[in-house]
């Protein structure tokens, strides 16, 4: 894949070269999207809109740290949707990992989560965030145990992954109406990079065939059900809906 590769002063240029080789990235200075190695992390920038800033994965500080420490924990909608109860902590495959936020919430509660990501740049960002989290004194030990990245297409993983998970979680890219600064920023950068998940409807059937317990699909509250298939049940929040489907 062609993308502009930049190394900031103080960062390791050889590390950027190794990263490009690992993920099959080819430097192209004409590309709008830039993958930038800073002295502290890897981030994605949309060069024609510098005010959007960089997008990167951070499980240690910022929003995710606050959510881990002060969020709803088992009371979060995603936790309810996957079926967490008392001593039951399902094994989860997040087949559309993205920045790994919901996967992190589930892992912080105690679930083992295998994250599947097919886009090389997004996978590189996610791996960078995981590596830094693995080294953290507070969360590193359980992060290494509970959060793993699989670089593969969702369709491929849903037919080949082993062992079989209790829950398959899907959060396909969908156009957002909200004007939230965070969502607007990330959606504009991400959609410029990966576009919409136009094959998302085709993931529901293999997900239902794979899961031992249930499939959970996160949707904006205004969106139709995935594949136009009515859900068995739903957990709703202010802006989203977690549709629940039984396994086949």
Curated annotation (Swiss-Prot):
User: Which chemical reaction does it catalyze?
Assistant: guanosine(1516) in 16S rRNA + S-adenosyl-L-methionine = N(2)-methylguanosine(1516) in 16S rRNA + S-adenosyl-L-homocysteine + H(+)
Q: Which Gene Ontology MF annotations are present?
A: rRNA (guanine-N2-)-methyltransferase activity
Group of enzyme by EC: transferase
Keywords noted in UniProt: Cytoplasm, Methyltransferase, rRNA processing, S-adenosyl-L-methionine, Transferase
Q: Source organism's superkingdom? A: Bacteria
> One Pfam match, by short name?
SAM_MT
Give the subcellular location: Cytoplasm
The UniProt entry lists the main location of this chain as: cytoplasm
What does the record give as EC number?
Answer: 2.1.1.242
GO cellular component terms, A-Z: cytoplasm
Entry-linked InterPro entries: 16SrRNA_methylTrfase_J, SAM-dependent_MTases_sf
Query: Quick one: which residues bind S-adenosyl-L-methionine?
Result: 101-102, 117-118, 153-154, 171
Q: Does the keyword Cytoplasm apply?
A: yes
Q: Outline what the protein does.
A: Specifically methylates the guanosine in position 1516 of 16S rRNA.
Membership in a protein family? Belongs to the methyltransferase superfamily. RsmJ family.
Q: This protein is called what? A: Ribosomal RNA small subunit methyltransferase J
């Amino acid at each position: 894949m062609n993308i502009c590769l930049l190394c900031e002063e103080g960062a390791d240029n050889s590390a950027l070269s190794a990263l490009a080789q690992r993920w099959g990235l080819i430097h192209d200075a004409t590309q709008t999207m830039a993958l930038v190695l800073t002295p502290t992390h890897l981030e994605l920038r949309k060069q024609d809109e510098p005010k959007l800033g960089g997008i990167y994965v951070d499980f240690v500080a910022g929003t995710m740290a606050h959510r881990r420490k002060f969020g709803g924990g088992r009371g979060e909608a995603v936790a309810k949707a996957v079926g967490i109860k008392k001593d039951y902590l399902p094994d989860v495959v997040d087949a559309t990992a993205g920045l790994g936020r919901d996967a992190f919430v589930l892992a912080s509660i105690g679930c083992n989560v295998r994250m599947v990501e097919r886009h090389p740049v997004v996978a590189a960002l996610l791996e960078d965030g995981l590596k830094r989290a693995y080294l953290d004194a507070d969360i590193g030990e359980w992060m290494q145990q509970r959060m793993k990245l699989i670089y593969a297409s969702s369709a491929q993983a849903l037919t080949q992954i082993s062992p079989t998970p209790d829950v398959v979680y899907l959060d396909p890219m969908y156009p957002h109406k909200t004007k939230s600064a965070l969502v607007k920023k990330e959606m504009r950068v991400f959609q410029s990079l990966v576009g919409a998940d136009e094959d998302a409807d085709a993931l529901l059937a293999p997900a239902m065939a794979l899961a031992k317990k249930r499939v959970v699909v996160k949707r904006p509250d205004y969106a139709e059900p995935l594949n136009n298939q009515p859900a068995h049940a739903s957990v709703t929040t202010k802006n989203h809906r977690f549709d629940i489907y039984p396994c086949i």
